[in-house]
């Protein structure tokens, strides 16, 4: 099948793949055609970020699909990076991870605390990767406009 990959800015390209190909393979093909290192690529399908280790079929990507490509600045972490190093180096979250480390150290042995923290970071990063653009838009709207709280209608079922 042929996929179209469209950078936010720049010329799109087509890549020939099977539905069983991994996202990382698509990134390598795009790298060859657009001269953008795979480590700087973030592929999106219908607003959802694609994880390198998943297959195209995991996202129900079929023939003639269009993928959006976001190019990260050089040096920014890739989605396949190890969780602890990227999360600890992240300026916005380093305080949170340091605080978590302190709390875990009070309740676990150093080895167990490290394992628990590593798993929490992996789960956190996986959750972030699964956010769609719609999810992010809703979250931003709630944060920017808290006075317009949405009424909980779950009790109406």
Swiss-Prot record:
One of the GO BP terms on file: post-translational protein targeting to endoplasmic reticulum membrane
A Pfam family of this chain: ubiquitin
GO terms under cellular component: BAT3 complex; cytosol; nucleus
CDD domains registered for this protein in UniProt: Ubl_UBL4A_like (cd01807)
Record keywords: Cytoplasm, Nucleus, Transport
Compartments (UniProt record): Cytoplasm, Cytosol; Nucleus
PROSITE patterns registered for this protein in UniProt: UBIQUITIN_1, UBIQUITIN_2
Classification via InterPro entries: Ubiquitin-like_dom, Ubiquitin-like_domsf, Ubiquitin_CS, Ubiquitin_dom, Ubl4_C_TUGS, UBL4A-like, Ubl_UBL4A-like
Gene: ubl4a
GO molecular function: protein-folding chaperone binding
UniProt keyword annotation of Lipoprotein present: no
Stated name of the protein: Ubiquitin-like protein 4A
Functional note: As part of a cytosolic protein quality control complex, the bag6/bat3 complex, maintains misfolded and hydrophobic patches-containing proteins in a soluble state and participates in their proper delivery to the endoplasmic reticulum or alternatively can promote their sorting to the proteasome where they undergo degradation. The bag6/bat3 complex is involved in the post-translational delivery of tail-anchored/type II transmembrane proteins to the endoplasmic reticulum membrane.
Oligomeric and partner information: Component of the bag6/bat3 complex.
